[in-house]
Amino acid sequence: MDNHSSSSNPSSLSSSSSSSSSSSSFLSDHVKKEEQNGLDTIKEEIENKIENEEEEEKIEEKPIEKVEEEKIIVQKEEEEKIEEEPIEKEEEKKVEEEKFEQDNINTTVEAKTLETSTEPIATEVVDEKSITSNNENLEEQQKEDVISIPPPQQEQQEQQEQQEKQKEETKPSIREEVKEKIKGKLSEIKEEIKDIKEEIKHVIREEVTEPIIVVENNNSPPPPPPPPSITVQSSSPVSSQISSPVSSPVSSPKPSVTFNEDGRKRKEGGITASISSEDIMALSSSTSTNNKGIPKENKRTASTILRSKSSPNPGANNPNHNKDGNNSSSSSSSNNNSDNNNNSDNNSNNNNINNNNSSSNNLNYDSSDIDTEAIPKFYHDFKIHRGTSSCVYCGENTRLWSTSYKCFFCGVVCHKKCLDSMNTIPCSSAIHNIKGKNRSQTISGYAPPNSLALQAPPYISVAKPSSITNSSSKSTPSLLSAPPSQSNSNNSSPNISSKSNPNSPITTSATTTTTTATISSLSPTSISSPPIASEQPPSPLLQQQQQQQQQQQQQQQQQQQQQQQQQQISTTQLQDLNNTSEKPDDDMINLMFDTLMVDLDLNLPASKLSTTQKWLLLEQKFKLKKDELLPEYFINALKEQPSKSIFQSLVVILRTNVTKNWMCSFVQLNGVEILFEILSKSKRKDYKDDCLSCIGKVMSNPIGLNSVAQLPMAPKTITKVLRSKQYCIKSKAMAIELLTVMLLDKYVPGGCSLVLKALTKTKEKKRFSFFVRFIKDNESLELKTKALCFINVLIFEMEDMNVRVNIRSEFLRLGLYTYLREIKKTITHEKTLFTQIEIFEEMMNEDTQELDLRLEDLKRQLGIDIDDVDQVFKALKNTTSKSGLNRQLLNILQNLLVIKACDPTDGVKYFILCDTLVKQISLHKGGFEDPSNFDFRGLMVGLESATAEVTLNRKLGELEKQNIDKAMKIQEQDINIKSLLDLLKQLKDGGTAPDASMIKKIEEMIKQMEPPPPPISVKSPDDPNNAAPIVVAPIPPPPPPISGAPPPPPPPPPPMKGGAGPPPPPPPPGKLGAKKPPAGVQCRPPPKVPKPSHPLKAYQWVKLAPVKVNDSLFDKLGPMNDINLPWNQIEEEFAAKVIVREKKAIVKPKGPTQVIDPKLGQNISIFLSQFKGVEPKQLITYIQSMDESKMSRDQVKQISKLLPSREDLAALKEFLQAEDRSKLSIADQYCIDIGAFPFASEKISMFLLKSELKSRLDEVKPQIAAVSVACDEVYKSKKLIRIIEIILVLGNFINYGTPRGDISGYKLDSLIKLSDTKSSDLSSNLINTFVKYCQEKEPNLLTFADELPSLTTARKTIWSGVVADVSSIGRDVHSVKQIVETLQKSNEPFNQSIIDFLATASTEVEKLRKLLESTQENFKKLCKYFAEEEGKSQPEEFFDIFGRFITLFENATTQLQQQKEEQLKEEKRLQQKQQRQERAVRKLTTSNESASASPNHAKSTDDKSDEDDDIVNDLLMAVRDGDAFRQAKGRRRTTHQIATSKMISNNLDPSKILPTSPNKN
């Protein structure tokens, strides 16, 4: 019995020292050495005592038999109350039977030891009463979630009472012997332990918690008190566990006293471990109900899991002496010494491995596999690596040639940003550096030595109840199943296996388990009763009972196998790896590894990796601790000190292992608000991208998306990311995707308005400019697609059509659609972006059609043309009159008038601002309750650009008006030219000399085209003084239009005096009066009227030309001499205000005098400004020498139009008679010089022809050549002839049996009438049918337009203009020849180079005339070839028929191609939709089968459902494919009936005229 005492006392001391050592890992090496020396001393005492026990082993045979009998009796009682748990496997039974003999020997020794014990062995002893009470209240404590902790004093008293009862049964001699030997040493050790504890408290600054005592009891009355089994458990990696169970003659309760100490957070391998007594209480509080529903076989499996996690043989676990230490419960025989030593080593190794498991994944290892001293610290050795492999840590791909790192040993690749985290993870190649005694067994994991691992009590199991249920069958592999622990057959430990039965007598166990950190399960851990070992071979009665239990177990296993077969292995989550106590079989490891590679999107060579290496990778993947996976951990970390590693860990959790309960807890703890606050306010750039990634993963979960939808600040915060320079392009693209999801009203109610408001309040002038720049600047088509998806969803989600049009117009003004049309031609290979562009165009076309319908309805309802200002004003006036708002309308109009009168820029800005304000008010539907609803701050943004646009449009309008005026003048000149050509033709046809009237008529028309030359002298017949005429250089008369014509007659005499009225007044000074009719045209004279005494107001009438007066009504009027008007009264009533002008003239300084016509003088001044520093006389020299280097063609043309008239020359003559020439303006002086230049007009004409002949020929020749070539191309085109044949057959078939059928030919214009014949359903026409035939039967005809390249130019040529130009060139050359002849006859000097020029020009004109005639002949042949009338058809009309036919043909080809592409896209969409529906059905079927399989196996709310995988990705895929738009296409489309049903109210409210948007639910 002394042996027992000597082995028990050190056990308690060892447990105390191990408890201290668990916390003293933070102390200096000095404290550790003192503790180690104390443990060595205890170990020596235990070894000596074991030797004495072996000698007395044979004496104690008789008590062993009694103990065995009592055990059988107890087992029978247990079988009567409750069904025993079936024995596990036959292999275990054989192992246990072999151990029974050894266990019996050990039990005998322990019984002797207890009899001689006289004093408490440990500081915590539990007597029978406390054990009984604790056992009775165990279930109540589990329900109340409280674990009772007896006070230390009460425990000591109970232990003392228990020891006193044991003294009566044991031998006094053994008790006294043990007492005397150990008492002294115990007191010394206690003092050392107290000192160490005090020092630990001082260093750690926290009190050592009271030990947790867990006692399991049964409701049945206990048998007589046996000697207790005391187990002291500690979590220190250097402490030992000593257990001394004793078998008494009667089976007695064996309480398990377990001590657990609060741990302190410590970084080991990058992992933070922290488990306190409160954590264990929380874990064990809510498991009572879970354990109730667990079947017996599952409870058996739970016990197996606990046993596999515990040490097979508790013993000394000090790594410093594990090679020599012995187990206290070892046999006294010498034959078992070696086995005990091995057990000691195994226990030590097992403890170390369990400690390492706290940093890994709570994976248990066999105790004989690893030599603790041979385990070094072995981490990754990363080298720079170039490649595109995925990161093992975060799962993201790297860009080509970007920096990544690869482990030299295991080949794992990680990003630079994940390098710090990966350096804390042990390398998988550590398997090659681990040295164990048993190499045949597989080493399942590795962790660095000296890692702090805190152990939990043995009754705590990390496996979920549902997980345990699925793990009892051995035939079906499961991630959650734990195979039975492999213990040494020679290991004599009493707690290897037992039956956990709540109705059985008290069951105890001294097991050691390691705290696990489960990723998948955050629910409270289950509590299971640890088993005890059978200490004697079973009796025949017991064997019969065990067989019955085995049969029941087999039936239950079969039921479980059927349930597990219904569940798919693929749905097993990799996070349940932490629930596995030992390494599963190879097939399960391969399945887990393949699933992990798929989740991480990696392509590691699985065939090259061994099963052990795969298992190590799985361990590294799920290395996180349980407390690091809790939402509270991340919330506290984000609040206190956020870092890049925290965000990366959170992203991993959210991406792979998040559950509904986890997400609910995260949301309830305001985790979403914290993320947005960090994203908004933090100035750190290193983790902002990771923070945005966390938000994206949160939104991928329905619970997280709902939480984000309730945050008003979310859209604004994400919008800031777009314009911030702190984020990369990838993060901005993610922000665009998140905003796209927020726009979907179905998932984020009201999100569209929040996003739009956030974009409006940005500092940019144009709120959507970022998205347009994002599309234009980025070359990636994927990024373009994301931005365009946002734009389409934004426009689509707007219910009001006016708002949609307004938003779309903003994008159009930014140039979005122009860019989209350009890239649409080059991105046909990118179907997604092409689809988004088509959706943008479809929505735009639909809104345009709907707007047109509304406008038409509005016109019909109002009965006015809304484009007419007068009609709109009348309707508005009538509406305001009925409403009594006339005064307000008048005030608005008056204010508009004031704006225009006060502002010098005609109030452009104000009118634009008013237009914008009224437009926004008309679109506003919210009422006037809240004035803040009106947003006027952004109105001034586009005011400057709009003003510039209006100003530019005004200038463009003026220029267009000028161009129209010039075009009209040119047209009038063309008419005059044609008239002259007709006259010339008449003269040629007649062959006789024309009479004088005809010559005068021609001269008059020439004068109208060009200013006439000035006369030699002009007299004023009405001048009373009859002054001498102005003498200038003699100007010969103009050359005759034809040879042989007489010179023109002199000017007509002055008008006749007389008549009833007074004589006409003299002309004003310096003027010749009103212009008289030209000399060449005779018409009746104007009526005689008296001269007013002062200027009168002008009468704005239009003067008829003399040619038009003849043969008109005015030519047949009477003499009109009898009309005597009240001349004086008219002068008084219509007098002009000339007095004011006289006063201004007096004040005004006197400038140069201008005599000629003001308009002519202004034009001459502008022309002379081009020749700065050149005198007017020098210009005459340029004309005389025909120097083209001095004067250009345009300048010569201008100077030909600026010749002074005869009236101007006469006025200048009169002025020079009275005043000096220096007083005249420069324009007047120029007119004097040019008038004195002989033959000025003729020489200018010669110069003009020489300068512009080449350009005129170059303009006409290509047009003639284009028509000529086009005739040849059409005539020789075989494909065109084939097309005409096919159409002839098609037409006869269509018109068969009608008068239009059965024909042999048709007119060419029938080609363009093919599109007029529509199909029955109006979806196609005859040209489409023809194109389809060509595509299928004769595809070579599709390129017939390539044979007609000149057709485009020929159809644009105006043939009549070409003919006129050729004739004009010929006349001009002939006219210049006549001028040269006249100058030669008059001996007038001129430039002789003109003679050579005329010779060359005549040759060119002759060639041009021949080319024209040849082309006309070819065209006549072509018309005859196609059965067209020669005289009626012009070339431009003929070729235009073919051009229009080509356009129709190409349009039909494009339309058919688009229809084909649309059909293919629609088929692809339907196929994708069908595939998604099939996947949804499969998911639903799988979930239903899983739910209907068994109520115990139904999917809990804590499991990760398939529907919650990634909702954001699914929504974006629907948007990209276009399904989101097409499915809801009819949701908001307002019909024509709705628009017409809205009647116009009296106040013309636009909200009542136009359909209102439906309210969103």
From Swiss-Prot:
Residues 1019-1081 form the FH1 domain. One of its GO terms (molecular function) is small GTPase binding. Residues 80-89 have a biased composition (Acidic residues). GO terms for cellular component: actin cytoskeleton; cell cortex; cell trailing edge; filopodium tip. SMART domains: C1, Drf_FH3, Drf_GBD, FH2. SUPFAM superfamilies: ARM repeat (SSF48371), Cysteine-rich domain (SSF57889), Formin homology 2 domain (FH2 domain) (SSF101447). Residues 581-929 form the GBD/FH3 domain. Residues 29-51, 162-187, 1466-1481 have a biased composition (Basic and acidic residues). GO terms for biological process: 'de novo' actin filament nucleation; actin filament polymerization; cortical actin cytoskeleton organization; mitotic cytokinesis; sorocarp development. The DAD domain regulates activation via by an autoinhibitory interaction with the GBD/FH3 domain. This autoinhibition is released upon competitive binding of an activated GTPase. The release of DAD allows the FH2 domain to then nucleate and elongate nonbranched actin filaments. Interacts (via GBD/FH3 domain) with activated Rho-GTPases. This is Formin-E.
